[in-house]
Amino acid sequence: MTTFTKLSEQETPSISVHASRRISKINPNIYAGFTEHMGRCIYGGIYDPGNPLSDENGFRKDVLEALKELNIPVIRYPGGNFTATYHWIDGVGPKDQRPARPELAWLGTETNHFGTDEFMKWCELLGTEPYFCLNFGTGTLDEALAWVEYCNGTKDTYYANLRRKNGREEPYNIKYWALGNEVWGPWQVAQMTKEEYAHKAYQWAKALKLLDPSLKLILCGQDGTASWDYYTLKQCLLPAHSPLSTSTVPLIDMHSIHMYTCGSTHLPNVTAPLAAERAIEITSSLIDLAMIENGIPPDQPRPTICFDEWNVWDPLRAEGSKGAEESYTLSDALAVAIWLNVFVRKSKDVGMACIAQSVNVISPLMTTKDGIIKQTIWWPLYLFSKYMRGWTINAHVSCGAYEGETSPKWIRAVKDTPWLDVSATLGEDGYANVAVVNISDEKDMECKFEGATGDVTVFTVTGDSVSACNMKGKEEVGLTESTWDGKGAYKFPRHSLTLLRWKAE
């Protein structure tokens, strides 16, 4: 938890950190990823058979090794909008017998050469857990139940045996399943009203948990601030109505929300993720309201928020229909750092967050035929995933605030926009970690710092300007490491992310 006192521009900024004041446990799943059959994410990204850089499975070895550096706990698959017309059965069995299908989300052709078993093999090599999204467009409940049976079944049943026939004896035990993707959107095949979706989602959830009670089901929300979110939570945050169950545990475990941010200039761009912080706060209250109105006993688990699509994305700059290949700037990297600060600050409410996406498509990692490029946004992801774990701890920031235009405009009315955006954690290893984003593109911030004990390791991500970017053969934004004695004031460079780390006493 970070609190803020607004100062005049003439007053001296300060940050105080209290490592002994633990606020909430951070779920490591806030550093989750996302791979969709879109653009070059799968084909030409993680899967590129015939490329000299690929292994015997067709998986790009350089991509696997790079993503291991991010220590990604969960990866969402296969979409995204793609799921609304995807039939999982097309993507299993001998590849020469798999049908090619028209793909309606991005208007391509899906070969189905990469499907459930390939993805699971890739996850095992990466050391990550899968999160599957069900087809709520053209899919059926029977099809969804069959997919769960194929993945998790242990009995002598048809789809469990089909998995065994396809070479996998043991069940995959896939835990996380989403009840559709952005079903509210007019771009979706088989878009629904909130009333239609809530009825269908509850019935599917009931059946899925009868088949496998261990599943964690994720409800399809909107952006956390819409009537869709309230209505679907109210209708679906209920226990199963079944003669076989007297449980009072809600069928729904998490509520999904999506948001992408961008701004036409640096300061609206870098402050835009504060809209997500307000959306999390509103969604959290809607979850509480649904539990109260539905009479869910207080001893039952409280659903958390699954922010399973987030990133900086300007669709005009990187059109989805053309593969959404963003070229990220330092400004975007600082915005991603603030996104991550938000998830740390709101760790009590956020159970998972999936950056969209993990390779090539609005991604920190780009592939070429002969290598990879770590974009500017790679570095905040790397630092946060490596160090910002454990518990959120108390920090207080006193500094001036940006008072100009924001994107969206309503941020100005509901959130402070300090020049220094901060989150703080205490790791299992006993180290305190403080992430500070100086959003100013003009001014270094000399800041009184209280709470550091002993020598401080300092990691800095910055560049010559907010427009600096990384491309093949030219890395303008990277990571530097230094030390500080932890005494007095620290100067946070303009347009930078700084992570301070020390052994707490």
From Swiss-Prot:
Cellular localisation: Secreted
Enzyme Commission no: 3.2.1.55
Transmembrane spans: none
GO molecular function, one term: alpha-L-arabinofuranosidase activity
Glycosylated residue positions: N81, N152, N269, N438
Keywords: Carbohydrate metabolism, Glycoprotein, Glycosidase, Hydrolase, Polysaccharide degradation, Secreted, Signal
SUPFAM superfamilies: (Trans)glycosidases, Glycosyl hydrolase domain
Recorded coiled-coil stretches: none
Family in the record: Belongs to the glycosyl hydrolase 51 family.
Entry function: Alpha-L-arabinofuranosidase involved in the degradation of arabinoxylan, a major component of plant hemicellulose. Acts only on small linear 1,5-alpha-linked L-arabinofuranosyl oligosaccharides.
The name this protein goes by in its record: Probable alpha-L-arabinofuranosidase C
Species, as recorded: Aspergillus fumigatus (strain ATCC MYA-4609 / CBS 101355 / FGSC A1100 / Af293)
Lineage, broadest ranks: Eukaryota, Fungi, Dikarya, Ascomycota, Pezizomycotina
